[in-house]
Curated annotation (Swiss-Prot):
Keyword Protein biosynthesis: yes
Subcellular locations according to the entry: Cytoplasm
InterPro entries named in the record: Ribosome_recyc_fac, Ribosome_recyc_fac_dom, RRF_sf
Lineage of producing organism: Bacteria, Pseudomonadati, Pseudomonadota, Gammaproteobacteria, Cardiobacteriales
GO molecular function, one term: ribosomal large subunit binding
Entry keywords, A to Z: Cytoplasm, Protein biosynthesis
Descriptive protein name: Ribosome-recycling factor
Annotated PANTHER family: MITOCHONDRIAL RIBOSOME RECYCLING FACTOR PSEUDO 1 (PTHR20982:SF3), RIBOSOME RECYCLING FACTOR (PTHR20982)
Amino acid sequence: MTQEILKDTQSRMKKSVQTLEADLTKIRTGRANVSLLDHIEVEYYGAMVPLSQAANVNVTDHRTLSIQIWERDMVAKIEKAIINSDLGLTPNTAGQNIHINLPPLTEERRKEMVKVVKNEGEQAKIAVRNIRRDANQSLSKLLTQKEISEDEQRKSEEEIQKITDHFVAEIDKVLMAKEKELMEL
């Protein structure tokens, strides 16, 4: 029973770290990244679909994204979706291709982004701690139902704390990498 709680705790904490990593890819750094446009949706035959389902997005160089659009009539819709996004990007259209030059971030903007990254990291740490609390409550419930002994509970709580420490360190590592990426010129 305690093994199930430990496995569930570990998988939920791993998902928290993966969610943090996914959220951080949406934060614009000075470097081009195809995931920057992942959240942009365009109208495609009456339905809203992710940009990646209407075009190929590639990194041309460290500051340029290239979008190859599959259908000519989608060019204007995709261009409009990029302009209307919260990324502040200006697309340059050439036939069925759109090129996006990413302007370098100002020092002030970089510092703002670092604050956002730290906030995202803190939210992930809170999620991990909440998962730890839930697991410890499950162990307490098993103890009151006499399904485990106090020694098993204590040993499992120590194991949960080790798992928590591991994932908090993992979050710190992800945050440091993103902050370093943001502060690079």
